[in-house]
Amino acid sequence: IKNYKNLRELSIDSLARVNLIVGCNNVGKSTLLEAVSIYLANGNDEWLKTILDFRGEMVNVDSAKGDVDFSQVLSEHYSSLFSGRKMDFRNATAISIGEQSDLLNIKLVHIAEEQRGGTIVRWVYNDDDADSGEHLFRYIGDGLSVVSGSNAPMLIPFFRRGFPGNVKDRVPFENVLPQDFHLRKNVLLFDRISLSDREGYVLDALRIIEPSIDRLNFLNENEYSNRRVPFVTLKDTGERVRLSSMGDGINRILTVILALVNCKGGVFLLDEFETGLHYTVQTQLWRVIFMLSEKLNVQVFATSHSHDCINSFIAVNRGGQIIRLDNRGGEIVAVNYSDDKEMEFIAQNGVEIR
């Protein structure tokens, strides 16, 4: 990962099926997950805007309030993705994510427009093109060029509001943030796996906190609303209970596991594993995550700065690894822990690896 926010040049030697990313505050754990998600989304403009919105960097501009320089506004928005919030036209400052053989690159470019056989074509140009005289084009503004592997560049112009792109994800992936307890998206995620064996995995996870749960469904919250919310029935009484009344922990587990089981053959990203979870249930949830990651072929990236989370991960580890991010003189470096004996020593001696 190169030139993405505070990750000027981060290399991770190896990855496991389940990866726990640890480190002190503001070292770049969440930033690492963001970079992975951008790679998985093939740099899709809509996903970039979603990330900017998550971080409060995307401002909705009301054009009715007067002249709005969208080029300036969008340039400021997207510059927050680059190291030092600075982007220029040099390759040296471009964002790069991925393996050397299959990089995703994002850089600032000039965008030109010309007529080709009755069709208006937009493309990236440089000063050599302007000097050569080979093209009859006009410069129409600046923007981002996103190149994924050997694919043609996708252009994100700053001079107008963009339209939703038609860029497909590399693989299925879901991203769960610390504040995600009652996602509206959960309804869609549940519908995708309803009546399949994956619905059973969700129920098993909820039983970590409430063993008497029998069934789960998303129902209209009342007769006056079309909004669907999760309800469960209890084995002993048959009573139907709204899940939101059972506490944050069980709702967090629902969000986590619904997202995970929708990533079959893909990647699951979980920021701050321990959020909303009492330490007594963390080991059981890790056990479920390890089982599902293997059964559904899902690669997992989770972050934490909690000793309870780290120790519970180590207690049930099955081929996973811990990646510690360190700030060494302003440069973020990664240290991998994957050896079982090494992890056992960490757990038994309380070694500081956060």
Tell where the protein language model's regions lie, with residue ranges.
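Phosphate-coordinating catalytic segments in nucleotide- and nucleic-acid-processing enzymes
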Residues: N42-T255, I323-R324, R328-R354
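Switch/communication elements of ASCE P-loop NTPase nucleotide-binding domains
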Residues: I1-T50, T237-I353
